[in-house]
Amino acid sequence: MIRHILKIMWNQRCSNGWIFAELAVVAAVLWMMIDTFWVDYRTYHAPLGFDIGNVWRFKLSDLDAKAPGYVPDSLYHSSDPEDLTRLMTQIRQNPEVEDVCVTFYSCPYSNGNSWREVKPVDGDTIYAAHMESFQMRNVTPEYFRLFRIRTVDGEPVYDKVAGRHNVIVITPEMAEGFYHGAPNIVGRRVYHGGHDLSSEIAAVSTSIRTNEYERPEASYFQCLEGETYNSTVSSFGASSAEFCVRMKRPYTQNEMNLFLDGMGERLKVNNLYVYGITPISSFREQQLSQKEREANNKISLMVFMLVNVF
């Protein structure tokens, strides 16, 4: 029957050309829809490269000069990096806390967008002739342990960077662009922020994605340790840090509020203090809601096109 109908349509193709045109449009639209949905599905369910379970972001600020407990400059004997380090230590000592780290515009789902020019010192690659800009994440070494980031070989990145100064961690996409699959990438050096500063590659992490709707891109982590930590904290200010804490078990908002109440003065170092908390999952929901609206608009447009074809 179908062959007979197609045969009739073919014999009358001159008068029924519009039918073939409509079928071609329908087929094209269906293919676009299926291809788009499949790509989005695969992208959404691909590994992110990090884990935000039980992670909270503590909000930091500086006491106002008129606030009770304010420490005047005449009595201030520590620096911003020292205060931030001490605050991390005080919170980490709580038995309910699993880990603590600090980042600057680099926390997952924070919309951080710091870029820096990078070039391999010894790479014979497409990037060797001139500096290229890549997204940079400023993180303390504990970041890799807290968010459970691993190397391409499945080992903890934290073990590769702990206690080391002036090292970076690059993603596989950046490693491929620099060295095109060459062995022994770890230990090589790259220039970043100009030719006056070079850092050693301590590890190649797994691919890192910004969110569930984005594909992984070439990027790198600058490990804040030693002088790099001091200069970065002094530049941005301790209260600008993204202070992340992973708890040992899931907590509700009310339970976390009680946790803060129990910490008391341990949430304050000189004029630096914690004034609030937000689960990282809330930042995820905010960021994905916009992406989901865009995806729904795409679906609506495709359905509209399909309905109009019929």
Language-model region placement:
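A short amphipathic helical element positioned immediately N-terminal to and/or at the very start
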Residues: 1-10, 87
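Alpha-helical membrane-protein architecture signal
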Residues: 2-6, 17, 296-302
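Acidic-histidine catalytic/liganding microenvironments
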Residues: 12, 91-95, 182, 267
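Short, strongly hydrophobic transmembrane alpha-helices
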Residues: 13-42, 50
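Membrane-proximal extracellular/periplasmic loop immediately following the first transmembrane helix
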Residues: 36-123, 130
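Generic structural signal for small/hydrophobic residues in well-ordered secondary structure
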Residues: 40, 58, 91, 97-100, ...
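Mid-to-C-terminal secondary-structure elements
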Residues: 106-288
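N-terminal membrane-entry
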Residues: 290-309
